[in-house]
């Protein structure tokens, strides 16, 4: 039944992919599971099906789900102003040529979901360099939003779409509304009910021995191993990135 899928997945190994791991569920039942290759190519450690992976932007699914759970409880409306809950966003600036001007529109909660708030995705922005330095490398999720609010927007909120830190700010919003750490809220309301006991947003819980090595192909098509030191979204010891911070 799945022989063609087997062959397709194996073809990635022939093209230099170190390994793969795929599970297919239907109506709550695992109907397909296959893993091949290496979780650590250099040390020839084979995939065993128990590895954890950096989910990167797939983390956004959990973040949006967590926020919508709070919406279902009637704790906010999508058309509410973000500044009603996070005052640092009350007087935003917008880039205007070589300068900035005052924003004429407020950021709404719905803009965080739809990537239309006007934020950028510059991980090395001066404000975020300050974030790391001024928090001593702790970098709590709620504090992240305060530093992002210092940065001028790319455009008026709701004016256009731009892939950005919207879901990282949404994670901080979840903390404000729920009164809990973002990762803890997700753990109790999503991970545990779904049986995802090996999933976390909290960097201190990352057992790097169980996380598969990461690779990329450079501009010349050569496979390179990614150093843990350049996982750029992990700003600090307590930062839980709603946009890219889930390990599962």
Please describe what each predicted stretch is:
Residues 2-55, 75, 91-96:
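Short, conserved catalytic-motif segment at the N-terminal edge
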Residues 6-10, 28, 54-80, 170-175:
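Active-site SXXK
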Residues 17, 75-76, 180, 196:
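Helix N-cap/coil-helix junction residues
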Residues 34, 80, 180:
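Short beta-to-alpha loop/turn elements within the nucleotide-binding domains of ABC transporters
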Residues 83-91:
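Acidic helix-start/capping segments at beta-turn-to-alpha-helix junctions
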Residues 92-248:
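Short, surface-exposed loop or secondary-structure junction motifs
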């Amino acid at each position: 039944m799945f022989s063609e899928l087997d062959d397709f997945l194996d073809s990635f190994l022939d093209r230099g992919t170190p390994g793969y791991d795929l599970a297919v569920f239907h109506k709550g039942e695992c109907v397909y599971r296959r893993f091949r290759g290496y979780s650590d190519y250099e040390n020839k450690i084979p995939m065993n099906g128990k590895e954890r992976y950096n989910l990167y932007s797939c983390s956004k699914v959990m973040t949006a789900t967590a926020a919508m759970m709070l919406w279902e409880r009637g704790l906010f409306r999508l058309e509410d102003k973000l500044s009603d809950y996070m005052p640092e966003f009350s007087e935003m600036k917008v880039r205007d040529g070589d300068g900035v001007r005052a924003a004429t529109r407020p950021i709404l909660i719905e803009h965080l979901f739809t990537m239309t708030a006007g934020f950028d995705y510059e991980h090395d922005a001066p404000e975020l360099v300050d974030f790391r330095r001024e928090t001593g490398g702790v970098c709590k999720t709620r504090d992240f939003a305060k530093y992002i609010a210092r940065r001028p927007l790319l455009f008026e909120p709701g004016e256009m779409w731009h892939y950005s830190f919207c879901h990282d700010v949404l994670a901080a919003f979840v903390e404000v509304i729920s009164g809990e750490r973002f990762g803890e809220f997700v753990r109790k309301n999503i991970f545990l009910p779904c049986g995802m006991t090996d999933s976390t947003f909290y960097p201190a819980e990352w057992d790097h021995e169980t996380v598969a090595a990461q690779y990329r192909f450079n501009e010349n098509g050569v496979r390179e191993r990614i150093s843990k030191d350049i996982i750029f979204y992990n700003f600090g010891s307590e930062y839980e990135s709603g946009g890219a911070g889930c390990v599962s």
